[in-house]
Structure formats: C-alpha cells, structure tokens
A protein has these predicted regions:
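Residues on the lipid-exposed face of transmembrane beta-strands in outer-membrane beta-barrel proteins
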Residues: 18-22, 65-69, 126-130, 140, ...
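Membrane-embedded beta-barrel scaffold of Gram-negative outer-membrane proteins
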Residues: 23-36, 56-124, 129-131, 137, ...
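C-terminal beta-barrel architecture of Gram-negative outer-membrane proteins
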Residues: 39, 48, 175-230, 241-245, ...
Length: 286
C-alpha cells in the first residue's frame, strides 16, 4: 500500500540586519542585531517515522557588540566582538540505525532532520596582528563559546529507548561542534634577506561530534614550523606540521556496532587528523 503525506508548502520567512556604527580616529565601534533563517523541509526516506517526516524552519536572532581599532602607532590591528545568539526550532542531524538483515547488526544508517525547541549561545571572538618591527610580525586569535540546547527530547540518541519510546533529555547540554575555547598564536621572522622562519601554536577544547551520542574530540594543542626562502617569482619552504605528534580526533561515531568479532557491540569509532608531517614545497608566480 502506498501512503501519501500532504504538507503545506506555503510559509513566510524573513530576515534582516540593523547596525549602529561609531567611527573615531582610532577605529570603529559597532552594535548590531540580525535575524536569519534556514528553511524547513521533508525527510523523504520511507524508514523515517511519519511523525518525524517534516522538520520546521529554524530562525536565529544574533546580537553583537564589537570594535575594530589600531594601536601603538598603527602597528597593532585589533578586532574584538561579544555576541549572543538565540535560535528557535533548531534543525539537528539525526539518524536511524537499522539492521540490514534480521534484528541485529550489521546495520545501515538513515539520516534525517528534526528540530530542537531552542538553543542559546554566547561568546567572545578576538583577533590581533602586531607588526613588532620591520623583521618580526606576530598574530593571535581567541574564541570563547558557551552553548546549550533548550527543551530538546532526542529520540534517536544512543541513550534513548526506542522500545518504550523514551527519549534522551538534552535540555542544558552543549551543542555539537562547539568547543568552549579556540586559541592560535604565531609569528613570522625575516631573519635574513629573503629568508623567513615562522611558527604557530593552536589549541582547542574538547567538543561533541553529534547530538546523537557522547563521542567527541579530545582537547588538543598543535605546533607548526616553517622555514622559507623567497625570490621575486619563487617561494621555497621546508615545514613540519603537528610537531609534537599529537593525537587529534576529527570525526567520530558512537551509536552502532561494526565489528562481528565482538558481536557488533556498540562502541566508538574515530577518524584522526594527520600525525607529525614533514614536507617541502615550491611555488612559482607567473
């Protein structure tokens, strides 16, 4: 039997931006409020339950205060902003884990979209470039972020119970892909004619990969170095990335089993970032 579901395809959506700017001899101060949206839609896979076939339009209000200025006789460029974001009907990526044959894994994924009632975020972003002298330039950036779901009952979370229809309550839990801090520091030193030495340090807090499970990235720190030689047309370099050979999780899954040796028990699976990497490069400008 064929079941046809009808949905109203007419919907009014609106967005906009209002900003106030104050310019001084030293820079620009601003305040803004903006509203954006992400259109809703339909989950077309027939495996998705009828009551979750449609997902609603998401909207977001963003409020921001910031400054862009120059300091120390224009040798420092500074940009900083604080923000608050209120999101309603947050679209979240979900997935059904369905056995391919019988009632046990191996399994397949059916991806679909659903809505959390709301989410709240606030944070700070800062960037700085400092021309220390004719031979040395430094840079730094900082990002601080706090996020949380509001009133989100997740029926596809690994800790939900599909047999009884009991969801996993994610109210107050952090959003995925939202580390609480990100830091970058670096410098470029021209120590001889046409020769440069640069280094960069970056750090990121731990964060969840998905709203379906508790698997996430570990907090990590990375160090990169580069020695370069430049002519009017050629640019040569030797470099090392991830100098300390840190282990970085870039992606992960934690809601299914994939190994028949342990009876397809549910366990995490990870993809990792590049290990310590040495290399050389050459570029020619035509």
């Amino acid at each position: 039997n064929r079941v046809v579901a009808a949905f109203d395809t007419d919907e009014g959506m609106w967005g906009g931006r209002l900003a106030l700017e104050y310019r001084t001899a030293g820079g620009l101060w601003y305040a803004l409020a903006s509203r954006g949206y992400k259109a809703g839609g339909v989950n077309s896979d027939s495996a998705v339950p009828d009551d979750q076939r449609r997902f609603d339009t998401e909207s977001m209000w963003n409020y921001e205060l910031g400054v862009k200025t120059r300091l120390l006789d224009d040798r420092i460029d500074l940009r900083a902003a604080v923000f608050v974001q209120d999101r309603d009907d947050v679209q979240t990526d979900q997935a059904l884990v369905l056995p391919i044959v019988g009632d046990a894994c191996p399994c397949e994924f059916v991806d679909y979209q659903t809505n959390a009632a709301a989410a709240r975020s606030y944070g700070l972003e800062m960037e700085m470039n400092w021309r220390v002298n004719r031979s040395l330039e430094a840079f730094a950036s900082l990002g601080l972020l706090e996020t949380e779901f509001v009133d989100f009952l997740n029926f596809s979370h690994v800790e939900a119970d599909p047999d009884t229809g009991t969801p996993f309550d994610m109210d107050g839990r952090e959003l995925p892909q939202a580390p609480s801090y990100q830091v970058a520091l670096g410098a470029v030193w021209e120590f001889a004619r046409r020769w440069t030495l640069s280094g960069e340090f970056e750090a990121k807090d731990d964060f969840l990969f998905s709203s379906r499970h508790q698997v996430g990235s570990n907090a990590y720190e990375l160090v990169h170095l580069r020695l370069g030689y430049r002519t009017p047309r050629w640019d040569f370099a030797v470099f090392v990335r991830n100098l300390t050979d840190a282990t970085i999780r870039t992606r992960g899954f934690g809601s299914f089993g994939n190994d028949p040796r342990d009876g397809y028990a549910v366990e995490p699976y990870y993809q990792f970032g590049a290990p310590r990497t040495f290399g050389v490069s050459a570029a020619y400008a035509f």
